From Swiss-Prot:
Known function: Motor protein that may participate in process critical to neuronal development and function such as cell migration, neurite outgrowth and vesicular transport.
Gene3D superfamilies xrefs: 1.10.10.820, 1.20.5.190, 1.20.58.530, 6.20.240.20, Kinesin motor domain, Myosin VI head, motor domain, U50 subdomain
Gene: Myo1b
Domain TH1: from-to ranges: 923-1107
Annotated organism of origin: Mus musculus
SMART domains in the record: IQ (SM00015), MYSc (SM00242)
The protein's name in its UniProt record: Unconventional myosin-Ib
Stated family: Belongs to the TRAFAC class myosin-kinesin ATPase superfamily. Myosin family.
PROSITE patterns xrefs: IQ, MYOSIN_MOTOR, TH1
Length: 1107
């Protein structure tokens, strides 16, 4: 039976509704209820068509593992439950397979999880793209750029512990295979005012706290910092520590990330020095001092902080102190210098700190771009990831919130335009009628802000540039004049009477009705922040710094390049950047992730319906669903649709043989689905009402239960039949085995009985024979015993007789001896003095030996073992003693000679001795090698850079490194090769490139052959059948033949414990591939020179002519 494969879908095991397009009925209450139901079951992702809604869970979920990455890899968008990985995979495959540039737009409030979403997108793309050393390096650099940018650009706010205080857009560049080549990062409007002041409950940028918490004591001392946060005025103390955040560990992560991205050590140190200088700038305090002319000026209270800053940045202390006290204004040909009061001095200090940090951040982004940018010039595919600050509504909203919310308005505008455009294009592409739906277009709000003549930004620039007194109040007055009638602008001075008594709208504020809601803006600081003014004196002081990084951050401080033109305002710069970003996004295929914050407490498991409702409204999610459902709520390609519902029709089940569209048409006709409820596109089926889809799902579920019942019935029948047949076969087998067992048992009984009977008979016969043999043995033993006793008696009698006769003879001899002694003593008593001669002889002999030894002491030869001199003996009788003394002295001086050698010298002499035993009187070349030291390493491989690759490839100790001539097996010509001998291998390498050509294990070397003549040719024979012997034996020529053969012999003996066979003959055989070739040495002609020549005569002979 064919196996049925049922593919999964987001419709399977669905909690709530996975795609809001299928929600029925569709209203705000059901929308929020569906999100809450999925949120409570840890389903934080929901679709609106191809748009992903992400609800921040404020905790880690086990849905981002490598296994999950593999689950969503190369899968259909609707095949699995909603996930950010599905959108990432869809965008990546569209880029790789369809050659469409992609952009992923991540929007939402601050704290909704946009930064984490962007990191998840990048990590997924990095996981699914290609592998390889270069590709992995690019992926690692792209991923590690995030920790660096987060440390310098993110901070804790009241709504988010890791809030992005800058906008980031990264273009990731891919090659035609989909492998990453590099990337380019663009940053937008760093909130640099945070450097000098933070709202209550918020922190400065992460890097300040990470540096003080994670830097070593040595580094802090070098940067002139202390670990105590309270020492620095620029750091807020009420939120210095964040629960669950380890600043020290994060600092180590940032340092490691900077190293991976490509920052050099001195660059990282320079960055930290600038950060330390910014921190210490906040500790500079001023005091007022009156001058003679009545003007107030400021003086620095404690110059110690100023001194340390100047030491860090290598700035002249006098120059920096003057820059804090005076301001120089330059006209065309005129300079005016004025003193700064205390308030102006503090303004100058804070402006310097903000500009220094802001420019450092821009330098960091450019430095990262240099490292991660694509190195090739080929055409690239691009995937853009936009992680930009979310819509912000605080108690006090200033210029930064105004700019941030303007950017979000533009993103909402492009979302509306591209969503409608994509929907309309799909209907046109599929030839489906398009039904228009009304929606709120926020273009009117964008125009209120960015209009070149009457826009708020244009009027702010105009106010900043006009002469005269310019304040935030004059700017507000101008807004009231121009924008008073605008329906989305509110102010106490506007012409609408209902705002005149609105106590929620202060006189110094204005309110804009954004797409996300109304936001009240304090005009205080708008003009200053837009001007972004830094006194020229401070710029010039920074340019004079000996610190190369700080000097590069202030090019306008160069006196040789004075530019009197006013720099562009912050608002105009940001407006131009946003316009460029919008144009960039419109050229790419958009993918949307809409992030939603479930509560303001940053806590898990809390779902604030009113807060979520507000976000749903201003994000326009309901309108997005209605746009998707304006024509048809559900659409699917024909193939997966037929695959999913084919069991509902007999004609399409189990296999449809024909086009998928025809199968779907047959299926829908069979199910009698009304024509007005569906339409057939070119490649997709479109279903108008979600109820129709759910009816299909119910029918499919019921049909699957019926199929399951059918499969169970067939399976149970098959199982019973199989069991019956098995029992039947088992009965036959059991009966056969039982009969066999019974016959075997009966045979064993008969056999056992026969053996018992046989054993009893054999035993009876054996016992009978044994009794007869024992009787015969006893008779023989009795006769032997009687004879023995008789012979013994006779022997004892004879022995007694012989002993008595011997005693008598001995007594006679003793008596005779005594008698002779007495007789002799009586006869020679008169000659007693004759004994003195013996004594004189012995004395004389002793004196001669003594004199001999004393003379030998003074005549001893030198201690050289090769000195053959030895004094002559004076007397013949001392000959043996003389030779023995010579032998003993020679052994003694040899021992003394050996004792003075080092281990290295002993090894050299052992090798020389080995060479002598192997080649003396056998090889004519040997005598010339005696005086030559064995060097081994004739090539300095370790020192020669040309052989670095060869050196890295050899991990063992090199015993011989020499250039030899390898004889070509085919024609006898020679080729230079590097001959290398290690502890375990013999290697041949190319002399020019150092590439290893051959590697032979010493265990495969069986013999070395050479001639007896004065030449350097030798053959290395290899074990037959070994891998190294595939081309045959080697034939070499070398000027150091004796040394190479000796070391090869000793090394082989040390490693294999077997002596290497050394054959010395003027004719020997070698194996060249499949042929055995005779190498014959002949006497050469002197006319051909003194160098031996080699020539291949035929397939069986190779001649070597030795002159």
């Amino acid at each position: 039976m064919a196996k049925m494969e049922v593919k999964s879908s987001l419709l399977d095991n669905m909690i709530g509704v996975g795609d809001m397009v299928l929600l029925e009925p569709l209203n705000e209450e059901t929308f929020i209820d569906n999100l809450k139901k999925r949120f409570d079951h840890n389903e934080i992702y929901t679709y609106i068509g191809s748009v992903v809604i992400s609800v921040n869970p404020y905790r880690s979920l086990p849905i981002y593992s490598p296994e999950k990455v593999e689950d969503y890899r190369n899968r259909n968008f609707y095949e699995l439950s909603p996930h950010i990985f599905a959108l990432s995979d869809e965008a990546y495959r569209s880029l790789r397979d369809q050659d469409k540039d992609q952009c992923i737009l991540i929007t939402g409030e601050s704290g909704a999880g946009k930064t984490e979403a962007s990191k998840l997108v990048m990590s997924y793309v990095a996981a699914v793209c290609g592998k390889g050393a270069e590709v992995n390096q690019v992926k690692e650099q792209l991923l590690q750029s995030n920790p660096v940018l987060e440390a310098f650009g993110n901070a804790k706010t009241v709504r988010n512990d890791n809030s992005s205080r800058f906008g980031k857009y990264m273009d990731i560049e891919f090659d035609f295979k989909g492998d990453p080549l590099g990337g380019v990062i663009s940053n937008y409007l760093l909130e640099k005012s945070r450097v000098v002041k933070q709202p209550r409950g918020e922190r400065n940028f992460h890097v300040f706290y990470q540096l003080l918490s994670g830097a070593s004591e040595e580094l802090l001392y070098k940067l002139k910092l202390e670990r105590d946060f309270s020492r620095y005025n620029y750091l807020s103390l009420d939120s210095a520590k964040v629960n669950g955040v380890d600043d020290a560990a994060n600092f180590r992560t940032v340092r490691n990330a900077m190293q991976i991205v490509g920052f050099l050590d001195h660059e990282a140190e320079a960055v930290l020095e600038v950060v330390a200088a910014v921190l210490k700038l906040g500790n500079i305090e001023f005091k007022p001092e009156s001058r003679v002319n009545g003007l107030d000026e400021s003086k620095i209270k404690d110059k110690n902080e100023l001194k340390e800053i100047c030491e860090l940045t290598s700035i002249d202390q006098v120059v920096l102190e003057r820059a804090f006290s005076f301001r120089t204004v330059e006209a065309k040909q005129e300079k005016v210098s004025t003193t700064l009061n205390v308030a102006q001095a503090y303004y100058a200090r804070d402006a310097l700190a903000k500009n220094l940090y802001s420019r450092l951040f821009s330098w960091l982004v450019n430095r990262i771009n240099e490292s991660i940018k694509a190195q090739t010039k080929v055409r690239k595919k691009v995937m853009g990831v936009l992680d930009i600050y979310g819509f912000e509504i605080f108690e006090d909203n200033s210029f930064e919130q105004f700019i941030i919310n303007y950017c979000n308005e533009k993103l909402q505008q492009i979302f509306i335009e591209l969503t409608l455009k994509e929907e309309q294009e799909e209907y046109i592409r599929e030839d489906i009628e398009w039904t228009h739906i009304d929606y709120f277009n926020n273009a009117i709000i964008c125009d209120l802000i960015e209009n070149n003549t009457n826009g708020i930004l244009a009027m702010l620039d105009e106010e900043c540039l006009r002469p005269g007194t310019v304040t935030d109040e004059t700017f507000l007055e101008k807004l009231n004049q121009v924008c008073a009638t605008h329906q989305h602008f509110e102010s106490r001075m506007s012409k609408c009477s209902r705002f005149l008594n609105d106590t929620t709208l202060p006189h110094s504020c204005f309110r804009i009705q954004h797409y996300a809601g109304k936001v009240l803006y304090q005009v205080e600081g708008f003009v200053d922040k837009n001007n972004d003014l830094l006194y020229r004196d401070l710029s010039q002081a920074m340019w004079k710094a000996g610190h190369s990084l700080i000097k590069s951050l202030f090019p306008e401080g160069n006196p040789a390049k004075v530019n009197l033109k006013r720099p562009p305002t912050a608002g105009s710069q940001f407006k131009a950047s946003v316009a460029t970003l919008m144009r960039n996004l419109q050229t790419k295929n958009p993918n949307y992730i809409r992030c939603i914050k479930p509560n303001d407490k940053k806590a898990a498991h809390i779902f604030n319906e009113s807060l979520v409702c507000h976000q749903i409204r201003y994000l326009g999610l309901l309108e997005n669903v209605r746009v998707r459902r304006a024509g048809y709520a559900f659409r699917q390609a024909y193939e997966p649709c037929l695959e999913r519902y084919k069991m509902l029709c007999k004609q399409t089940w189990p296999h449809w043989k024909g086009p998928a569209r025809s199968g779907v048409e047959v299926l829908f006709n069979e199910l009698e689905i009304p024509v007005e409820e569906h339409s057939f596109g070119r490649s997709k089926i479109f279903i108008r009402n979600p109820r129709t889809l759910f009816q299909l799902e119910d029918l499919r579920k019921q049909r699957l239960e019926d199929l399951a019942t059918l499969i169970q019935k067939i399976y149970r029948g098959w199982k019973c039949r199989t069991h019956f047949l098995l029992m039947k076969r088992s009965q036959v087998v059991i009966a056969a085995w039982y009969r066999r067992y019974a016959q075997q048992k009966r045979y064993q009984q008969i056999k056992s009985s026969a053996l018992v009977i046989q054993s009893y008979i054999r035993g009876w016969k054996a016992r009978k024979i044994l009794r007869e043999l024992k009787h015969q043995k006893r008779c023989k033993e009795a006769a032997t015993t009687i004879a023995a006793y008789w012979h013994g008696t006779q022997a004892r009698r004879e022995l007694k007789r012989l002993k008595e006769e011997a005693r008598r003879k001995h007594a006679v001899a003793v008596i005779w001896a005594y008698w002779l002694g007495l007789k002799v003593r009586r006869e020679y008593r008169k000659f007693f003095r004759a004994n003195a001669g013996k004594k004189i002889y012995e004395f004389t002999l002793q004196r001669i030996v003594q004199k001999y030894l004393l003379e030998m002491k003074n005549k001893m030869p030198s201690l050289s073992p090769i000195d053959k001199n030895w004094p002559s003996r004076p007397y013949l009788f001392l000959d043996s003693t003389h030779k023995e003394l010579k032998r003993i002295f020679h052994l003694w001086r040899c021992k003394k000679y050996r004792d003075q050698f080092t281990d290295q010298q002993k090894l050299i002499y052992e090798e020389k001795l080995e060479a002598s035993e192997l080649f003396k009187d056998k090889k004519a070349l040997y005598p010339s090698s005696v005086g030559q030291p064995f060097q081994g390493a004739y090539l300095e491989i370790n020192k020669n850079p040309k052989y670095k690759k060869l050196k890295d490839a050899i991990e063992e100790k090199i015993i011989i490194a020499e250039v030899v001539n390898k004889i070509n097996r085919a024609n006898g010509k020679s080729t230079s090769r590097i001959f290398l001998l290690t502890n375990n291998n013999l290697l041949l390498a190319d002399q020019k490139s150092g590439q290893i050509k051959s590697e032979v294990p010493l265990v495969d070397v069986t013999k070395v052959s050479m001639s007896s003549q004065n030449d350097g040719f030798f053959a290395v024979h290899l074990k037959e059948g070994s891998e190294a012997a595939s081309k045959g034996d080697f034939l070499f020529s070398s000027d150091h033949l004796i040394e190479m053969a000796t070391k090869l012999y000793r090394t082989t003996l040390s490693q294999t414990k077997q002596k290497l066979n050394i054959e010395i003959s003027d004719e020997f055989l070698v194996q060249f591939r499949q042929d055995k070739v005779c190498v014959k040495f002949i006497q050469g002609n002197q006319k051909n020179g003194s160098v031996p020549t080699c020539k291949r005569k035929n397939n069986r002979l190779l001649e070597v002519a030795v002159p």
